[in-house]
Regions:
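Acidic/polar, glycine-rich intrinsically disordered N-terminal extensions of enzymes
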Residues: 1-60, 592, 600-601, 605, ...
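Terminal amphipathic helices with adjacent charged low-complexity linkers/tails
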Residues: 57, 75-130, 263, 269-378, ...
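Mobile "lid/hinge" segments at catalytic clefts and subdomain interfaces of large enzymes
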Residues: 176-318, 326-327, 342, 417, ...
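Segments forming glycine/polar-rich beta-alpha architectures that bind adenosine-containing cofactors
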Residues: 601-673
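Extracellular/luminal Protease-associated
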Residues: 265-272, 505, 730-770
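Acidic, glycine-rich flexible loop/linker segments
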Residues: 548-561, 773-848
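Long, structured ligand/cofactor-binding scaffold of large enzymes
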Residues: 29-231, 243-246, 348-351, 359, ...
Length: 863
C-alpha cells in the first residue's frame, strides 16, 4: 500500500495526473514499483513537462466493428498460434471488460424516404452476414466480451449514455475486491475521448494496443505534459457546442498540443452542460491531443442520474470524487502551460473544406469555398451545369451541396443540438421552405434515445417534411458511409466542385464521398439551413435562404431557435425514462441478428472461401529485430503534409479496377457486393491491396495522378502501389515511406500500419507523426524515423533515392543511437545524408520491436 498523499506536491497535480497516479500505483506489481511510478508521475506533473515511462492499465476497452473485427481475428489467430506452440488457447482471453458496438457498417444507401431505416438495416445485414456471424462467435467464445448489435447507436454516444461508470470497483472491471477506483478506458476509435466530457480518462489507441490491453498487458506511455485550457464567460445566445468545439480545434491545432493532455478549467468549463463538454472532448483527435478532460461537478452526477445510472452508485461516485479532492475547482494545480478562451467570443462556426481545424463562419464560407475551388481548378464561379431533378431542371454552379447529413456522436450526444435541428426544421416548414432537390438528406441519430427525443418532442415530423428521414443508428456519413450521391448530380461529379455539409467531426479529402470535393462541418441546425440553401457558395449572414410563402425573405437568423425555446422542449421531454426506453433492447438486436447462430469454440473454424474473415499472417511473418538497419531500400510512396490514416488505409467503397476489386472479382464477388474497405478489414488480403488506395491520395511518385498509383523505381513504370510492392518483394527490396508533417493524423486505424507492413515497408521517414499512428507503426514492427534537419524538399529528396539507414540497437529498450544517420543515393551518384530521430519512445516499445511487434510479444508473454 502506498500513501500518495504523503508525496510532496502530489495534491497539486493536474486532475488528469491524479487519475493517472491512482491508476499506475494501484496496478503496479509491487510496492516498490508503485513508489517508482508515483515518483515519475509527480515529478513530471510538477515540472510541467512530459516525464518518464509508466504503465497505464485501463479498466476496460471500447471497440467499434470496423476496428473490432480485425482485433478478434487477431485473437483467433493468436489462439491458433498458441495451440501450434503447445499452449492452451483459452489463455488468449480478455482480462478486462470489452464492449464492441456495431456502428460502422450501416450506410445511407437509402435516404429521404420513410423506408430508409428498414431498407438500410436489411442491406447492412445482407452485406455483413459473415462479419456478424464472426462477431457472434467472438461474443460466445471469449470471456469479458459484450457485443452491441447493429442498429442501436454509435459506440461513443452509447459509452457516454450507458457504459461510463465514472467511478467503480476492481470487481466491476474484471478484478477482485471492492476498492473504489476511477473509470478509465482505451478505445479502437480516436473519438473515445468523448468520455473525457464526463471526466473519464480515456483515449483512442490502435487495435493492436487495445488487444494487448484487453489481454492484461499495460500500455506504456510517457507521463504526458498537461496544458490548462482556462475557459471564462458563457456561450452567447444561439451558439452551440459544435461552434465551441470547432473554435477549440482551431485554437489548439495552432498552439500545438500533440501528445499532450488538455485540462479544461475555470468558470466557463463549469457553465457548460455535460453533453456540451462531451462534444468538445469528442473532437480532441482533430488537434492531436491525447485527451481533453473536463471537471467533475454536480452537473455530471445529475447527468448520470438522468441517463439511468443507479442512484446509490452515483452517490458513491460523488463521495469518491470528493474524497480525491476533485470537486474543488479552487485547488491550485501545476500546468505546463495555460491557454485562455472567453466563451463569449465564440460565434457560429463551420470548418472545412478538408480539415476540422480550418474554422470559418457563415460570412466567410463563400470566400473559403471559392478559394479552395480555384486551387482545385474550378475557379470560374459563373460556370453552370444543367441538372435534371424530379422537381424540374436547374442551372447549378460550383458549390452545389450533394449531401447534407445530421450525423455523428459529436453532435447527437448533445440533446440541445438535436432539438435545435428539429426546431429549425419546424420553422422552415412553417415558412414554406424545403431543401433543394439535388441534396441528399441523411439523418443518423447517435443512439435510439436521440431518435426517441425527436419523436417525443414532436420534431421528427418537421424533419421528415424536409426529407430528413432516419437512415440508421450508426456513424454513416461521418465515416463516409453516405451511399451514392443523387443520380441527378452523379454525371457532373467530376466536372462540378460539389460540397457536403455535415454535423460530424472529420472532413478529410474523399472521406464523406469520393464524388464530393469539399466538406464542411457544422451544427445540426446549420445542416438544415444549408440543405435549404443548396449551396455553400453563399453568404448566409446577408443572403436569404429563400422566400417564405408570404413573399418575404427568410434569413438564417429566422430559422435558428432561441436557447429558451430549446430549453423549453428539453424540460418537457428529457428525463430518465427517455434513456431507459432508448436502451431497453440494447443487447437484443433485430430479428435478423437474433437468428444468427454461433456456437462457442476454443478456436475459430476459418472458412477458406471467405472473402471477409481470413486468418491473418502476423505470427508467421514476424521478424525479431534487436538491431535495425536498412540497405538498398526504395521509397514506395512520397507523400506530403497531413496525410491521414484514411489516405493510407481508406474505409470507404472499393473502387472498380483497383487491386482489391480485382482480388474480389477473381473470387467470384460481384461489384455490387464489394462493400467497403472498412467492412473487409477481417481479410488482410483485401486490406494489403487497399493500402495507399484512397482516391484522393497525392503521391509525388505518381506523375500527377491521384489514387493508388506510384512509380516502380525498378522499372520506371507507373503502376498500382500494390503491384509495385509485389515487384519489390519479388526482388528482395525493403521499402520505406517518405512523408511530411503530421503523418498518420485522423482515425486510430491500425490497418494504416498493418497494410504497409504487409506491403514490405520497414520504416517511415516523416517530418512528424500523429500520436496514435506512431505507436501503431512500432506495434507492427515498423520503425518511425522523424526528420531532424529539415523536410524532404529542403534536404533535396525526391523519393527516387536508394535508402540506407545506419544500425540502431534496441536490445536495451530505447534506441541506441536515438538519432540515426540516413543516406539517400540519388541518380548520378550524389548522396544526401540526413539525420532522423528514432521515434521509439519507451523501453517497452523497444521490446515490442525486438519481438517482431506487439502481437508476438504478447503471445510470448502468454506461453
Amino acid at each position: 500500500m502506498v500513501d500518495v498523499s504523503g508525496i510532496p506536491g502530489a495534491m497539486r497535480l493536474p486532475s488528469a495526473l491524479v487519475r493517472l497516479l491512482e491508476n499506475v500505483v494501484r496496478r503496479a506489481p509491487s510496492d516498490e514499483a508503485a513508489c517508482e511510478a508515483a515518483r515519475r508521475v509527480v515529478e513530471a506533473g510538477l515540472s510541467g513537462e512530459a516525464g518518464e515511462e509508466v504503465d497505464f492499465m485501463p479498466a476496460r476497452v471500447l471497440f467499434q466493428d470496423f476496428t473490432g473485427v480485425p482485433v478478434f481475428c487477431d485473437f483467433a489467430a493468436m489462439r491458433d498460434a498458441m495451440t501450434a506452440r503447445g499452449g492452451d488457447p483459452a489463455r488468449v482471453n480478455p482480462r478486462i471488460p470489452c464492449v464492441l458496438v456495431v456502428d460502422h457498417s450501416v450506410a445511407a444507401d437509402e435516404a429521404g424516404c420513410p423506408s430508409a431505416l428498414a431498407d438500410n438495416l436489411a442491406v447492412e445485414a445482407r452485406r455483413n452476414a459473415e462479419r456478424f456471424a464472426f462477431l457472434k462467435w467472438a461474443g460466445a467464445s471469449f470471456d469479458n466480451v459484450t457485443i452491441v448489435p447493429p442498429g442501436q447507436g454509435i459506440c461513443h454516444q452509447l459509452n457516454v449514455e450507458r457504459f461510463c461508470e465514472v467511478v467503480g470497483t476492481d470487481a466491476l472491471w474484471g478484478g477482485e475486491g471492492a476498492m473504489a477506483c476511477f473509470d478509465t478506458l482505451v478505445g479502437t476509435d480516436s473519438h473515445t475521448t468523448t468520455a473525457n466530457g464526463l471526466g473519464v480518462m480515456g483515449w483512442g489507441v490502435g487495435g493492436i494496443e487495445a488487444e494487448a490491453a484487453a489481454l492484461g498487458q499495460p500500455i506504456p506511455m510517457l507521463v504526458p505534459r498537461v496544458v490548462e485550457l482556462r475557459l471564462t464567460g458563457e456561450l452567447a445566445p444561439g451558439v452551440s457546442a459544435m461552434d465551441l468545439a470547432l473554435t477549440v480545434a482551431e485554437l489548439l491545432r495552432a498552439e500545438g498540443v500533440v501528445g499532450q493532455v488538455v485540462e479544461a478549467t475555470g468558470p466557463g468549463a463549469l457553465s457548460l452542460s455535460v453533453t456540451q463538454r462531451a462534444c468538445v472532448s469528442n473532437m480532441c483527435p482533430e488537434y492531436g491531443s491525447t485527451a481533453v478532460l473536463f471537471p467533475m461537478d454536480g452537473k455530471l452526477f445529475d447527468y448520470l442520474r438522468l441517463t439511468g445510472r443507479d442512484g446509490a452508485e452515483v452517490a458513491f461516485a460523488e463521495a469518491y470524487v470528493r474524497a480525491q479532492g476533485l470537486l474543488d475547482p479552487e485547488v491550485p494545480r501545476v500546468y505546463g502551460k495555460t491557454l485562455e478562451l472567453d466563451l463569449a467570443s465564440v460565434g457560429t462556426s463551420l470548418a472545412g473544406p478538408s480539415r476540422p481545424h480550418n474554422r470559418t463562419t457563415p460570412a466567410g464560407l463563400k470566400g473559403r469555398f471559392e478559394g479552395a475551388a480555384a486551387r482545385n481548378g474550378h475557379g470560374d464561379m459563373a460556370e453552370r451545369f444543367t441538372v435534371e431533378t424530379g422537381e424540374g431542371t436547374f442551372e447549378l454552379g460550383h458549390g452545389a451541396i450533394a449531401i447534407a447529413a445530421i450525423t455523428s456522436c459529436t453532435t447527437a450526444t448533445d440533446a440541445a443540438m438535436v432539438v435545435a435541428a428539429g426546431l429549425a426544421a419546424r420553422r422552415a416548414v412553417e415558412a414554406g421552405l424545403a431543401p433543394k432537390p439535388w441534396v441528399k438528406k441523411v439523418l443518423a441519430p447517435g443512439s435510439r434515445a436521440a431518435g426517441l427525443l425527436l419523436e417525443r418532442a414532436g420534431l421528427r415530423g418537421p424533419l421528415e417534411r424536409l426529407g430528413f428521414y432516419t437512415c440508421g443508428y450508426g456513424c454513416m456519413s461521418c465515416i463516409g458511409n453516405s451511399g451514392e450521391i443523387l443520380g441527378c448530380l452523379k454525371p457532373w461529379a467530376s466536372s462540378m466542385e460539389l460540397a457536403s455539409v455535415l454535423s460530424g467531426n472529420r472532413n478529410f479529402d474523399g472521406r464523406i464521398s469520393p464524388d464530393v470535393a469539399q466538406n464542411y462541418l457544422a451544427s445540426p441546425a446549420l445542416v438544415v439551413a444549408y440543405s435549404i440553401a443548396g449551396t455553400v457558395d453563399v453568404d448566409l449572414s446577408v443572403e436569404p435562404l429563400g422566400t417564405a410563402a408570404c413573399g418575404s425573405p427568410v434569413m438564417l437568423a429566422d430559422l435558428m431557435p432561441t436557447d429558451e425555446e430549446v430549453a423549453a422542449v428539453l424540460s418537457e421531454v428529457l428525463d430518465a425514462s427517455l434513456y431507459e426506453e432508448g436502451t431497453a433492447s440494447l443487447m437484443e438486436g433485430d430479428a435478423t441478428w437474433r437468428l444468427i447462430e454461433a456456437a462457442p469454440s476454443a478456436t475459430f473454424p476459418w472458412d477458406p472461401d471467405s472473402t471477409y474473415i481470413r486468418r491473418p499472417p502476423y505470427f508467421e511473418i514476424a521478424e525479431a529485430c534487436r538491431t535495425f538497419s536498412l540497405e538498398g531500400a526504395r521509397c514506395l510512396v512520397d507523400l506530403g503534409d497531413f496525410v491521414t490514416t484514411d489516405h493510407i488505409s481508406p474505409a470507404g467503397a472499393i473502387a472498380a479496377g483497383s487491386p482489391a476489386a480485382a482480388y474480389l472479382e477473381d473470387r467470384g464477388v460481384d461489384p455490387d457486393r464489394f462493400n467497403t474497405y472498412g467492412a473487409r478489414r477481417g481479410n488482410h488480403e483485401v486490406m494489403e491491396r487497399g493500402t495507399f488506395a484512397n482516391v484522393k491520395l497525392e503521391n509525388r511518385l505518381a506523375g500527377g495522378e491521384r489514387g493508388c498509383v506510384t512509380r516502380d523505381l525498378l522499372t520506371g513504370d507507373l503502376t498500382s502501389v500494390w503491384d509495385a510492392a509485389e515487384d519489390y518483394r519479388a526482388h528482395g527490396v525493403p521499402l520505406v515511406v517518405l512523408a511530411g508533417r503530421m503523418y498518420g493524423s485522423g482515425s486510430s486505424r491500425d490497418w494504416a500500419a498493418k497494410g504497409p507492413l504487409l506491403q514490405g515497408v520497414r520504416a517511415v521517414v516523416a517530418g512528424s507523426f500523429e500520436r496514435i499512428h506512431r505507436s501503431n507503426l512500432v506495434g507492427m514492427g515498423i520503425v518511425p524515423l522523424e526528420l531532424v534537419d529539415g523536410d524532404a524538399a529542403s534536404l533535396g529528396l525526391d523519393g527516387s533515392e536508394v535508402i540506407s539507414v545506419d544500425p540502431v540497437d534496441f536490445s536495451g529498450g530505447l534506441p541506441d543511437p536515438a538519432v540515426v544517420w540516413v543516406h539517400g543515393l540519388q541518380r548520378g551518384g550524389k548522396t544526401v545524408d540526413f539525420r532522423c530521430r528514432v521515434r521509439v519512445d519507451t523501453p517497452t516499445e523497444g521490446a515490442y520491436l525486438t519481438a517482431g511487434g506487439i502481437l508476438p510479444y504478447v503471445l510470448e508473454s502468454l506461453l
